[in-house]
């Protein structure tokens, strides 16, 4: 940790690295959090996530307040102003403290000559805040999504697109998966209650618990001993539909960071699991999760398009393919997705998913089950992908889950429920 730092300037740098360099917030934030005190880490996360969540609104306000935007080498100061406006409108930080710390951020960014400009813009926002936000509410920026994504969501869900967009813009709930090898869900709910943590069971998934308010993992009973895992309810649905059994050979493809790998082993502790991911670095997270839960799985680096290179002629009873996707179902959890994704990415991802599906299908035993899953809400990656797959593979059949008229199950993000997700359960005849 640095002995002296300005938190607002760090937040502005992080936002700039996401928007200008295309870096992932979830990869960047832990690096920068190491430079601040324990008490400031949560605030740094709040400022970075918050600015990226409401970015179009902040951009629109700055356009009204400044005749000329800050560009080039001064661009980070533009993001510093965003951090300032976000604090004034969305946080309980006393305005005088938010102003003072944000203005001082210009010094930390080696632009002390711009302190007066930043102070003036933020004070102007304070004076005009109510009128500005009333005007902004009628502007397209109010939806807080890029226009291409908004158009895709509206086209796919003409009757409820506004509800999806609204859910995307909310803070996500915190879900836990109770490790059934240690406790029943009811027993763990009692442990939470004894610790003063209010929580609610999921109506369908027997291991899932939603916390009334998010908390640090070190406050959770037995977290370090593997009694529970932080995992969204919709992600837990993957293993629910896979229905793994003891003694089976199971492939978890695109496995990182390992939440589903460990869930399989909780549901079927005597199964033989191979966890594969193309990203060697992220496979480290799989190993960390296995270690925390004291479980064993075979972990390999491998590209799903070329399974013969990492599993040769091996076949599996069950395959879970949580495919690379647009992640449009988890925007509320990763708001940088809105600004890192491009419209052209969707077709590229659809082609990649198709390639992996076709490549891995021969490695499923006859009579075996494959669950194809994404954290996307776009039909091209989900229902249309599955329909195309079934048309290419005569030995593939869709298992009727009795829950939907479409091929597969599409979950949409909802305030008190899970993230946006899609599952299709396929069997090889």
Swiss-Prot record:
The enzyme's E.C. designation: 2.1.1.176
Residues at which S-adenosyl-L-methionine binds: 254-260, 277, 303, 322
Keywords (A to Z) from UniProt: Cytoplasm, Methyltransferase, RNA-binding, rRNA processing, S-adenosyl-L-methionine, Transferase
Main location: cytoplasm
Highest taxon, organism lineage: Bacteria
Localization per Swiss-Prot or TrEMBL: Cytoplasm
The keyword Cytoplasm is assigned to this record: yes
Protein name: Ribosomal RNA small subunit methyltransferase B
Reactions performed catalytically: cytidine(967) in 16S rRNA + S-adenosyl-L-methionine = 5-methylcytidine(967) in 16S rRNA + S-adenosyl-L-homocysteine + H(+)
Gene3D superfamilies: Helix hairpin bin, NusB-like, Sun protein, domain 3, Vaccinia Virus protein VP39
CDD domains: AdoMet_MTases, Methyltransferase_Sun
Enzyme class: transferase
Function according to Swiss-Prot or TrEMBL: Specifically methylates the cytosine at position 967 (m5C967) of 16S rRNA.
Native organism: Pectobacterium atrosepticum (strain SCRI 1043 / ATCC BAA-672) (Erwinia carotovora subsp. atroseptica)
């Amino acid at each position: 940790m640095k002995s002296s730092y300005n938190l607002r300037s760090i937040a502005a740098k992080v936002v700039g690295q996401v928007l200008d360099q295309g870096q992932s917030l979830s990869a960047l934030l832990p690096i920068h959090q190491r430079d601040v005190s324990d008490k400031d880490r949560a605030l740094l996360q709040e400022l970075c996530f918050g600015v990226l969540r409401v970015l179009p609104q902040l951009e629109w306000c700055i356009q009204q307040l400044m005749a000329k935007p800050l560009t080039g080498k001064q661009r980070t100061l533009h993001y510093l102003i965003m951090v300032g406006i976000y604090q004034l409108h969305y946080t309980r930080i006393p305005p005088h403290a938010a102003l003072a710390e944000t203005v001082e951020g210009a010094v930390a960014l080696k632009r002390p000559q711009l302190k007066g400009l930043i102070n003036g813009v933020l004070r102007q926002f304070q004076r005009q805040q109510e009128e500005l936000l009333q005007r902004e509410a009628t502007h397209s920026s109010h939806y807080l999504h890029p226009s291409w994504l908004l158009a895709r969501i509206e086209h796919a869900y003409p009757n409820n697109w506004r509800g999806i967009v609204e859910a995307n813009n909310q803070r996500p709930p915190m879900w836990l998966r109770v490790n059934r090898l240690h406790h029943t869900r009811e027993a763990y709910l009692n442990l939470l209650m004894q610790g003063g943590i209010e929580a609610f069971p999921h109506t369908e998934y027997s291991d899932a618990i939603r916390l009334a308010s998010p908390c640090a993992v070190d406050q959770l009973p037995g977290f370090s001993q593997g009694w529970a895992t932080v995992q969204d309810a919709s992600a837990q649905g993957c293993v629910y539909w896979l229905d793994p059994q003891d003694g089976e050979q199971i492939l978890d493809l695109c496995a990182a960071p390992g939440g589903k790998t460990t869930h399989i082993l909780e549901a079927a502790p005597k199964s033989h699991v191979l966890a594969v991911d193309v990203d060697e670095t992220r496979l480290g997270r799989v190993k960390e999760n296995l270690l925390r839960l004291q479980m064993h799985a075979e972990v390999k680096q491998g590209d799903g398009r070329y399974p013969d290179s990492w599993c040769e002629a091996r076949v599996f009873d069950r395959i879970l393919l949580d495919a690379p996707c647009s992640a449009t179902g988890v925007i509320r959890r990763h708001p940088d997705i809105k600004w890192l994704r491009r419209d052209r990415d969707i077709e590229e991802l659809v082609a990649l998913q198709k390639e992996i599906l076709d490549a891995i299908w021969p490695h499923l035993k006859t009579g075996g089950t494959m669950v194809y899953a994404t954290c996307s809400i776009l039909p091209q990656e989900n229902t249309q992908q599955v329909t195309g797959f079934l048309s290419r593979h005569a030995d593939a059949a869709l298992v009727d889950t009795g829950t939907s008229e479409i091929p597969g199950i599409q979950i949409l993000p909802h305030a008190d429920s899970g993230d946006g997700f899609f599952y299709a359960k396929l069997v090889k005849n």
